[in-house]
């Protein structure tokens, strides 16, 4: 808890306006770092909901955050500073060996319910949740599109409706890729028109298994892509696949906290959970 707080507090202070985003001179006694750290302890406690996490933090060490507000006020503060957790991800340094111009691109379904409830589900439908089809069949919800380094450090992510094509999701993330880079992708990104468009406009070469004829190179492609599966399994282990949010903002803030925790552990700024 102490290590996590010190890490997040230092990252916030290193931002240009870290912790100083309020327009008034009224600074709450409970800092933004404290608000974020309590939520990030969800990965440590392996709890399903933020409320369980909040109660466990208070029960295990009530003196750690003496000015922590009540749960509802804390949750409202968390949603207001949610953009801070997204900004923090860009301040986590990359290891030198990770910056080699080779990227992994993939998407991950964020399901709102089990398939048996598809006929009557309404959760977050007005916020964009919709039916999509992935490698494991149909689902109702959103897609988390992720770009990472070859070694598995997340560079950028975006949350879209479940029916958004993987290639359209990749277009939103192209600014994270360097020119003359190579993106290793699955068959959901194949298509000569798409690949030619991305190469001509951004100078990034998308390579799928369908583009490779040599059997040995196909094995290398599959081996490299296992890293992105590791990313999603680590996010799943942090309960990123369990949705209890009742708004798009709440869902996105929760996913950002999972990714922030993953990035800190991957960068060895925190011990692996």
Residues of each region from the PLM?
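Short alpha-helical elements
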Residues: 1-273
């Amino acid at each position: 808890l102490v290590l996590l707080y010190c890490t997040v507090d230092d990252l916030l202070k290193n931002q240009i306006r870290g912790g100083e985003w309020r327009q008034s001179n009224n600074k709450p006694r409970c800092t933004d770092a404290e608000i974020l750290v309590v939520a990030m302890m969800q990965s440590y406690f392996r709890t399903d909901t933020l409320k369980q996490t909040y109660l466990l933090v208070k029960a295990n060490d009530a003196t750690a955050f003496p000015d922590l507000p009540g749960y509802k006020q804390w949750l409202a503060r968390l949603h207001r500073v949610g953009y801070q957790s997204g900004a923090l991800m860009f301040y986590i340094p990359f290891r030198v060996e990770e910056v080699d111009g080779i990227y992994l691109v993939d998407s991950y379904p964020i399901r709102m319910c089990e398939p048996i409830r598809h006929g009557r589900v309404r959760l977050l439908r007005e916020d964009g949740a919709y039916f999509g089809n992935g490698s494991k069949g149909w689902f109702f919800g959103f897609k988390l599109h992720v770009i990472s380094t070859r070694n598995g450090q997340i560079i950028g992510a975006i949350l879209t409706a479940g029916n958004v094509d993987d290639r359209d999701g990749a277009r939103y993330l192209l600014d994270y890729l360097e020119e003359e880079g190579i993106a290793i992708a699955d068959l959901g990104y194949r298509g000569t028109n798409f690949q030619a468009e991305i190469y001509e406009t951004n100078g990034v070469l998308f390579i799928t298994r369908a583009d490779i004829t040599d059997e040995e190179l196909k094995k290398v492609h599959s081996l490299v892509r296992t890293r992105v599966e590791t990313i999603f399994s680590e996010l799943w282990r942090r309960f990123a696949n369990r949705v209890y949010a009742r708004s798009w903002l709440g869902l996105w803030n929760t996913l950002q906290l999972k990714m922030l925790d993953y990035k800190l552990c991957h960068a060895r700024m925190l011990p692996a959970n």
